[in-house]
Curated annotation (Swiss-Prot):
GO cellular component labels: membrane
Domain of life: Eukaryota
Primary location class: membrane
InterPro entries: 7TM_GPCR_serpentine_rcpt_Srd, Nematode_rcpt-like_delta
Family: Belongs to the nematode receptor-like protein srd family.
Pfam families in the record: 7TM_GPCR_Srd
Descriptive protein name: Serpentine receptor class delta-18
């Protein structure tokens, strides 16, 4: 079983690293002038998801939640086990902070999409400040969560009692855990990981409906290309909103394990195995729907070296895929009120 999940983690993590690195490159060097400010949000996504994918391959985590109790046991089977337990603990803290920051970033993207229906687009500096504000809760989580992990010597005797049906002494990975989930750091971190997810998604879909309603109201003053561009961006954001549902599935798996309703090593491995799908698949939405990015991807596939040598943005017009016809992104970001 461990071999299957090891292959799973490596495959999705490497794919995610490649796609997010490609997206970051395109957002930095190939974004038309008209979407330079919005590209700040795209770069934020790509950087966050790249780090998340890289850390997933580094950690390859198995989570054993003690049924009905306030304790957790982690087993790290990735390369971090060859460096030391502290690297696994810090790595997990930063992996989880990437996961939460991705969710907040998605909310920011939908909020910004709604904002520019009524206002001019914001500068890159203002967007960067907003990203930093949304990042603060996740940063606090990253800097504190790893400090509450117990050592192998502390957790192993307890883990034997909690999971007598496992031979945990034979585990070759780094064994650690949290003995008390009721302390403030644990409550903050676990709460920040699990609780905002569903309220944020409800808010996102409310914003999505408001955006659709506003587009219907304003459609008589929009050009066909502008309406098509808004429609395609909304589709991209909607698809991107569904991709992190994998995180929701992982959270559900965790609650099933913590409640004791389901006990299975497959479930324990699957919590983090499912979560990696979100950052690995997320960049595809931008790589496909943002027309300049999609065109550069096609050119890259045809000639992988030429695009790396040419970092000029080229055009000042950005368009979204719209049923085969171009849509001006400049008008998308500056819709008339």
């Amino acid at each position: 079983m461990i071999i299957f999940f090891e292959i799973w983690h490596w495959s999705w993590a490497l794919l995610g690293c490649y796609l997010n690195l490609l997206l970051a490159y395109l957002a930095i060097f190939k974004s038309p002038k008209a979407i330079k400010s919005y590209a700040t949000l795209i770069i934020n996504y790509a950087a966050t998801d790249f780090v998340e994918c890289a850390l997933d391959s580094f950690l390859q985590t198995r989570l054993l939640a003690v049924p009905g109790e306030a304790e957790l046991v982690y087993i790290f089977n990735g390369p971090c086990k060859y460096i030391g337990s502290i690297s696994c603990k810090v790595g997990l803290s930063f992996f989880l902070h990437c996961l939460t920051h991705s969710v907040w970033s998605l909310l920011l993207s939908f909020g910004y999409r709604f904002y520019i229906l009524h206002n001019p687009s914001l500068s890159r500096l203002v967007l960067l400040k907003l990203i930093l504000v949304f990042y603060i809760p996740s940063l606090i989580q990253a800097l504190t969560y790893w400090t509450i992990f117990a050592s192998r010597e502390e957790i192993l005797p307890l883990a034997r009692q909690w999971f007598p049906y496992y031979d945990l002494d034979a585990e070759t990975g780094v064994l650690t855990g949290i003995i008390d989930l009721t302390n403030f750091v644990a409550i903050y971190s676990i709460g920040h990981i699990c609780l905002p997810f569903f309220p944020v998604y409800i808010t996102i879909f409310i914003l999505r409906q408001k955006i659709i309603n506003q587009l219907h109201v304003k459609q008589h003053v929009m050009s066909p290309d502008t309406k098509a561009a808004h429609s395609q961006l909304l589709k991209a954001l909607t698809i991107q909103a569904f991709i992190p549902i994998f995180v929701g599935i992982a959270v559900t798996f965790y609650f099933l394990s913590q409640s004791g309703l389901v006990r299975s090593p497959i479930l324990e491995y699957s919590i983090y195995a499912v979560a990696i799908l979100a950052p690995a698949l997320s960049p595809i939405t931008y790589l496909y729907f943002v027309r300049p990015y999609r065109q550069n991807v096609k050119r890259f596939i045809a000639n992988p070296f030429k695009i790396l040598l040419n970092t000029n943005t080229g055009s000042s017009i950005g368009v979204f895929h719209s049923g085969g016809r171009p849509s001006n992104f400049a008008t998308t970001l500056n819709t008339s009120r």
